[in-house]
Amino acid sequence: MRILLAAAVAAAAVAAPAFAQDAAPFTGARLGVTLGYDKTHDRDGFTYGGAFGYDYAVAPKITLGAEATFEDSTTKGDGIRASRDVAISARAGYVLTPKLLAFAKVGYDTTRFEIADEGHNNLEGVRYGGGLEYSVTPRTYISAEYRRTEYEDHFGGRDAGIVGAGFRF
């Protein structure tokens, strides 16, 4: 009986790894850097910063997540300079291939604009956009996205084309 029990335990131990599955792609916490082209009020420049997010697979090909970005910009002209930019967004993604995710996002944004002879003004708005994320390795990714921010008080909008790279952990 002991031999039978030992054989059963050994068989279960050998078979257990077969039940283990890799984590769904594009899930978990992520941290990355961003760089891109930024345009506000017919003035353009560069934007740069970082992003932190968390994504969860709700179905084999669908992810939902949240993201926070912290960026700065070189965009300036006519006495106005775009400065610090902080956004919090919800993100939904669809896995096109095991290495490629298409995503859309929408969220809240606040940007500081430095105004000559007046100091600064913080504007809030709605940010939306979409893009692609490519899994270079199971823990590293590169991404490209377009996003638009519509500010309050008829200030207008801001467009950005962003590329990024980061790690999942």
Regions found by a protein language model. Give the residues of each.
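Gram-negative outer-membrane beta-barrel domains
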Residues: 17-169
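Cleavable N-terminal export/targeting peptides
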Residues: 1-26
